[in-house]
């Protein structure tokens, strides 16, 4: 049995800004050259399975019982926005490029929970469960993911991997799909090895520039 959370929704002001930008632009356009920066809000596409990292107020009916994380094919779902945050206080100054090898937190914008994994089996593939955990962006050390990429910084046009700091698994999708109440959404889980199932690319979003606030300093995708 899946469960629906009744917690307070986080980030309504930010969501409104994102939706306004989307309406004004008529949708997403091809990503321009640049780097992913700390504080940016974006969607992440699994490049092999063509689904975006997603979460919502629905809990797993097994395993940890925490908020579920899935992959969706739709590009315009507001529940697919994640904020890039530092692994520690002051560890990711706003607007600075994210370094390859840097540990970050990915915070789900609408619920304020962090991308998380732990030693529970995932519901469909029996890999490692990936969930969303915490309140208002505050969780624990199992929310940390290392950005694995080539070169010095995370480039918006490049494919990257996210390796969990605590358990070493890679954020992955292998194609399993759920039934009701989230029919058609793909399972997201952790896998022990780097492969084609765990490459991701930055897509739609707002990318913070050094010294800029969210309302004025963005590059729209």
Curated annotation (Swiss-Prot):
Entry-linked InterPro entries: MIR_dom_sf, MIR_motif
Chief subcellular location: endoplasmic reticulum
Coiled-coil spans in chain: none
Boundaries of every MIR domain copy: 33-87, 95-150, 151-205
Cellular component, GO, one term: endoplasmic reticulum
Keywords from the UniProt entry: Endoplasmic reticulum, Phosphoprotein, Repeat, Signal
PROSITE patterns assigned to the protein according to its UniProt record, in alphabetical order: ER_TARGET, MIR
Subcellular location: Endoplasmic reticulum lumen
Database matches in CDD domains: beta-trefoil_MIR_SDF2_meta (cd23293)
UniProt superkingdom: Eukaryota
Motif (Prevents secretion from ER): 218-221
Residues spanning the signal sequence: 1-28
Pfam families per the UniProt record, alphabetical: MIR (PF02815)
GO molecular function: ATPase binding; misfolded protein binding; protein-folding chaperone binding
PANTHER family registered for this protein in UniProt: STROMAL CELL-DERIVED FACTOR 2-LIKE PROTEIN, STROMAL CELL-DERIVED FACTOR 2-LIKE PROTEIN 1
Protein name as annotated: Stromal cell-derived factor 2-like protein 1
């Amino acid at each position: 049995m899946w469960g629906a959370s009744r917690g307070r929704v986080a980030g309504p002001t930010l969501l409104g800004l994102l939706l306004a930008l989307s309406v004004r632009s008529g949708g997403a356009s091809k990503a321009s050259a640049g780097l992913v920066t700390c504080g940016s809000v974006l969607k992440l596409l699994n490049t092999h399975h063509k689904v975006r990292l997603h979460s919502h107020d629905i809990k797993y009916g097994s395993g940890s019982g925490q908020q579920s994380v899935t992959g969706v094919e739709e590009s315009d779902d507001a529940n697919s926005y994640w904020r890039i945050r530092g692994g520690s206080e002051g560890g990711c100054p706003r607007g600075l490029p994210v370094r390859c090898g840097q540990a970050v937190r990915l915070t789900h914008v609408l619920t304020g929970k962090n991308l998380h994994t732990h030693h529970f089996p995932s519901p469909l593939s029996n890999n490692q469960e990936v969930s969303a955990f915490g309140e208002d962006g505050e969780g624990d050390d199992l929310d940390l993911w290392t950005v694995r990429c080539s070169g010095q910084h995370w480039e918006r046009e490049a494919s990257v991997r996210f390796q969990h700091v605590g358990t070493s698994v890679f954020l992955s999708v292998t194609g399993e799909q759920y039934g009701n109440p989230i029919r058609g959404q793909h399972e997201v889980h952790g896998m022990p090895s780097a492969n084609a199932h765990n490459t991701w690319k930055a897509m739609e979003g707002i990318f913070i520039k050094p010294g800029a606030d969210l309302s004025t300093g963005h590059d729209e995708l």
